C-alpha cells in the first residue's frame, strides 16, 4: 500500500452543521438515565420508586418523592448534574417520571399517546443546611437546603405553564412554554405563521391574545421563611426570604411551623425596582422542591440519635442521684434556689401529652412563674433556659404586644391580600417561651395568651381570616410584686398584680424573696467572686456532678421524644387524696381570713401536679410514674404555689405588728434575750403563734433593729 501523501497526514477539521444536536442528545440520554433509575432502583428486592409512583397514581397524585442519596448511589454523575444545574435537569426528571407514569397507566401501545398531567418531582436531601444569611450570588441556580420558620403564607394563585396564543388577524395558534418560579413571560411581537396559497399576510405588531380556556395552569403559593431565633447572631435582626411553592407542595405548611426547605436559589426582578431604572438589580427567592417539616405532636420531627448516644443516655438515666445532678446542672452560675432549679428541670422535660377518645387534647407542657424581689436571678434563669431548650423564644413584657405574642395580620405589597405572621407563642411551638417583666405587660396583651397557655392554640378572626394556630409551648415568666419588693406584712392579693385567671394557668408559682441571712450572704458572695476571678477554671466553682451543656441539651431532647410516662395506681391514689387535702386546707385558710385566695387551687392544679409527676419520671426515662415521683411533685407544689397561696393572713399580720411593737418596748438598745425565753413569754404566755413571732423577728432583723446571734438563739437589740 502506498504511503500517505502530505495532506492525508494533517489533521481533519470540520464544522458541526447543527450545534444544538449535541445538547439535544445529552438531554435525551439524561432523560433515559432517569427513566432507568425510576424503573430499576431496588432496595431489598423492592422497586421503591416504581411502587411509590404506582400508589400515587391510584389516588390521582401525579408526583414522586426522590431521596437524592439513592440517586447518588445509582448514578453519581447524574446526581451531581441535578445538584449543580437543577433548573435545566429537573424538567428532564419530571418528563422521565411522566413517561414511566404513562407506561404504568397504559400498558397497550394505542393508549400510550394519551396525555396526562406532568408529574412533579419533590426532592429529599440530607446535605448540610445553609442559613439564610449565608446565601450569596454564588448559590444562584444551585440546589440549597435552608432551615427556618414559616411566618407568612399567601392564598393559592394560578400560574400558567403553557400559554395558548391566538393571532387576532390570521387566527394562527402557538403554544408558549413558561418556566417556573417568579419568572415573567414576554409574548412574541410578530406573527410568524406561514403564508398560505399566496395570500397576503398583514398581521400587525403584538398580534397575539391569550386563550385561557386552552392554556395550562398549576397552583402556586408564596411563603415567607424567617431565620429561627436560635440561629440569629446576637444583636442581629432575623432575616427572611420568599419561597415559591407549586402543585403538590402548596398548602402543606402553616405559619409558625419550623421546617427545612430544599429548593433552587433563584432571582426575580421587582416591578418597583424596574420602574426606578435599576434594571441590573434582582431580588432573591427560593423555588421549593422539597419540604421537611415538624411532626404533628408539637415538637420537632424526631431527631436522630446514634447508638452510642442512646447507650450513653440510658447510662445517664440509671445514675442513682440523677434528679439532684440535673437540678445542679440548671444555671450552675446561680447559687442556691434548689427548688426553683428543680421546677425548671420539670418544665424542660415536660409531662405527657394526651389525646382523649373524643379528640380533646390535654397539655403536657408545664408553666412556671417566678415572682419576687429584684436581684434574685430571675432573668438569669430565663436566659439560661432560652439557651438550653431545643426550641426557645425570649421576650420582654414591656416590649411585647398581643399581636407580637400571638399572630398579626399583614398585607402583601404586591397582591394586596392579607396573610398571617406568627408571633412569639407560635414561633416557639414545641418549645418554651420565656417572658421577662411579665408584670409590666398591659392587661389586654396579657389576656391574649390565656388561650395559648391552657388550650395551646391561638384563634384568629381578623380581616376576613378565621383560623387556629398551634402554640404548644411551656411558659416561663418572671415578674416583680406591685411595690417592687415582696412585703410580708401584706397579703398575696396586695403583693401580686395578676388576675386569678392567669395565675391558675401556672403549674408552679414561686415567691422569690431576697432575705438577709449572714451565712447565705457569705456563701453567695464567695460564689460570685469565684465566678468573676476564676473564669478559666470555672468548673471548680460549678456544681458537682454537672452534665456538660451540649450533652444535657441532647438528653432533654431524647427524653422528650422517647418517653411518655403514665401514672401507676399508687401514685394516682396519692395525688387524688392529696389534692382533696390541699383544697380543704386552702378553704380553711380562706374561711379564717374571710377572703378569697388570689392564687386559686382548682382542678387545673391537680393536672399540674400530674404533669410534674410525669416529668420527674421522664428524667430517668421511666415508663411509669411511681408514688415516689408523686411525693416529690406534691412537695414541689406545696413549696411553690400553695406556699404563695397561703401567705400571711390579716390575723397573722396583726399578730406580727403587735409582737413587733412589744419587742421594741421589751428590749432596750444594747440588751439581749434568748430565743427560748421569747417563745415562753409570747407563745406560751400571751398565746401568739410561733410563726408570727418568727416573722416579727425576721422583719426587725431586716430593718437592722435587732441582730440574731449564735445561729438565731440570741436576740440582740442593736438599733432603733
UniProtKB/Swiss-Prot annotation:
Give the stretches traversing the membrane.
none
Keyword Cell cycle in annotation: yes
> What EC number(s) does this enzyme carry?
3.6.4.12
BP GO annotations? DNA replication initiation; double-strand break repair via break-induced replication; mitotic DNA replication initiation; premeiotic DNA replication
Q: For binding ATP, which residues are annotated in this chain's numbering? A: 372-379
Mind telling me which SUPFAM superfamilies this protein's record contains? Answer: Nucleic acid-binding proteins, P-loop containing nucleoside triphosphate hydrolases
Q: Which residues form the MCM domain?
A: 322-529
Show the GO cellular component annotation of the record. cytoplasm; cytosol; DNA replication preinitiation complex; MCM complex; nuclear pre-replicative complex; nuclear replication fork; nucleus
| Name this polypeptide is given | DNA replication licensing factor mcm5
